[in-house]
Design a protein with these regions (language model features):
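Phosphate-group recognition and catalysis centered on beta-loop-alpha active-site segments
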Residues: 2-14, 22-408
Length: 408
C-alpha cells in the first residue's frame, strides 16, 4: 500500500491534529490547519531513507465522530491521516454506500423510523443469521433520509453527541471529498475502500466490484501508484478484480486471527482458512492473485496472551515481505479495553491508554502502515517512531529476522 507515500509527504503534525480534535464541528467541514515544515527523513542503519508508515483513518476518525460519515473523513484528514477508509455495501437500486456492514440499525436511526418498521427482517449473511434492517432493502433516496449515530455510545459519548447530524454517504461522495481534502491540505489523501460481504452481495444480484472499478476510473484513480487501494476479506473477488474486471489500482487481502474467508467457506474449501494465509505458501498464493498488501489483525503480528498482555512477535511480517507483500494491520484504538494490558492507563475500560506506546513494537516489527480509529494518535505514534529511527538507525529490523524463525 505504497501509493500515498509515492505521491506526497505528510503536511501535518500532532499539534495541528490536537487543535482539530478539540474544535467542535457545527457542520461536516473541518478548518484547515496551517501546514508546518515536514520533519527530516529518518535513515536506516545503511544510511538509506526509511519510508514513513502510513496512517489509515479507520472508518474516518471514528474515535471522535460517528463512523463512515463525511465529518469523520474530514476530521481524519485534518488530523493527518494519509488514507481514509470507506466500507462499501449496496442499496436496493445498486448504489454503493458507505457502512461497515449491510445491517444498519447499529449505526443509523432506522429503528426509530416508523415508516421503515416493516423492513425489519432476518437474513443469513456469510453463514450468520442477522435480524434488523439491511441496506439492500432500501433505495438510496430512502437511506438518505436516515441519520448516522455512534456505534459505541457508552465508550465514546463525545462522538455520540454528534448523533443525528450526518447522512449515510455514497462512495462517490467520499471520492469527491477526497479530491477536496487533497486540494485543501496540499497533499494526496488516499482512499482504501473495502468491499463488504462480496459473496453475499453477488448471490443477490448486487455485485459491487464492477461499480468500484467504474468509479475509480471516473475519478482517475484506477491506475498503479494512484492514491487508491481496494480491500476485501475474500480473495476470490480480489483475483477477479485483478484478472477480469480491469482493476489497475492496488489491492489488500484482509485476514483475521480465526475463521476463514467466506468465499472459501462457500466453495467447501476447508484448507484455505485465515491460518493458511499466514503461511509462506498461503502468502505466495495471495501474491499470485495480484494482491499487493496484507491487512491482518494486529494480534497476528504480535500475539495477545491469555491475561491480555502483549505476547511474542510472529513471523507474519517477515514472511509477507519475503513474498513481496506489504503489511498494514488493523485496528488500533485508544481506549483501554482495546489495548494490551501493559498499555492501559487504569481499570476504566473506556478511558484512553497509551495507544502511541503500543504501536511502537509493531512499527519495530516492520509494518508498512496501520488502521486506527484515532488518526491524531496514529500520527503521533509514527512521529515518535521516526524520531527514534533517526536517533537509533538499527531499530525496527523485526525480531523474526533476529530469531531466525522457520518459514512455514
Amino acid at each position: 500500500m505504497t501509493s500515498v507515500r509515492r505521491h506526497a509527504a505528510r503536511g501535518l503534525v500532532a499539534l495541528a491534529a490536537a487543535v482539530a480534535v478539540s474544535a467542535p464541528l457545527a457542520a461536516p467541514a473541518v478548518a484547515a490547519p496551517a501546514a508546518p515544515t515536514a520533519p527530516a527523513a529518518a535513515q536506516s542503519v545503511t544510511g538509506k531513507p526509511v519510508a514513513r508508515p502510513e496512517v489509515v483513518g479507520h472508518r474516518g476518525a471514528s474515535g471522535y465522530r460517528p463512523e463512515h460519515t463525511l465529518a469523520a473523513y474530514e476530521l481524519a484528514a485534518a488530523q493527518g491521516a494519509d488514507v481514509i477508509e470507506p466500507d462499501l455495501v449496496s442499496t436496493k437500486d445498486g448504489v454503493l454506500v458507505v457502512r461497515h456492514e449491510n445491517l444498519i440499525d447499529g449505526t443509523t436511526d432506522v429503528a426509530q423510523r416508523p415508516e421503515f418498521a416493516d423492513r425489519k427482517t432476518t437474513k443469513v449473511v456469510d453463514g450468520v443469521a442477522l435480524t434488523g434492517w439491511f441496506t439492500e432493502d432500501f433505495t438510496l433516496a430512502e437511506l438518505k433520509t436516515l441519520r448516522a449515530k455512534e456505534r459505541l455510545p457508552q465508550v465514546r459519548p463525545e462522538s455520540a453527541s454528534y448523533d443525528g447530524r450526518y447522512q449515510v454517504p455514497t462512495f462517490e461522495e467520499v471520492l469527491e471529498l477526497r479530491e477536496r481534502l487533497s486540494a485543501r491540505y496540499g497533499r494526496e489523501i488516499g482512499v482504501i475502500p473495502e468491499i463488504k460481504h462480496p459473496t453475499y452481495f453477488d448471490s443477490i444480484g448486487l455485485s459491487m466490484e464492477e461499480r468500484v472499478v467504474e468509479l475509480l476510473d471516473e475519478h482517475g484513480l484506477n491506475k498503479r501508484n494512484a492514491p487508491a487501494t481496494v480491500q476485501s476479506f475474500e480473495l476470490a473477488n480480489l483475483r477477479d478484480l485483478n484478472e477480469n474486471l480491469g482493476l489497475k489500482a492496488e489491492t489488500v487481502f484482509l485476514s483475521s486471527v480465526n475463521g476463514a474467508p467466506y468465499d472459501s467457506v462457500a466453495a467447501g474449501d476447508t484448507v484455505r482458512d485465515y491460518d493458511f494465509y499466514e503461511t509462506a505458501a498461503g502468502m505466495r498464493e495471495v501474491r499470485a492473485a495480484g494482491v499487493d498488501t496484507l491487512g491482518p489483525a494486529f494480534a497476528q503480528i504480535i500475539t495477545k496472551e491469555k491475561d491480555g498482555s502483549m505476547g511474542e512477535e510472529t513471523a507474519f511480517v517477515s514472511l509477507a515481505h519475503r513474498a513481496g507483500l506489504e503489511v498494514v494491520p488493523y485496528t488500533f484504538r485508544a481506549e483501554n479495553q482495546f489495548l494490551y494490558t501493559e498499555f492501559r492507563s487504569s481499570v476504566d475500560p473506556n478511558a484512553q491508554g497509551d495507544m502511541v506506546g503500543m504501536i511502537q513494537p509493531f512499527l519495530d516489527a516492520g509494518i508498512d502502515g496501520f488502521f486506527t480509529d484515532h488518526p491524531d494518535l496514529g500520527v503521533q505514534a509514527v512521529d515518535t517512531w521516526m524520531q527514534g529511527k533517526k536517533e537509533h538507525p538499527g531499530r525496527g529490523v523485526g525480531k523474526t529476522a533476529q530469531r531466525g524463525l522457520k518459514v512455514r
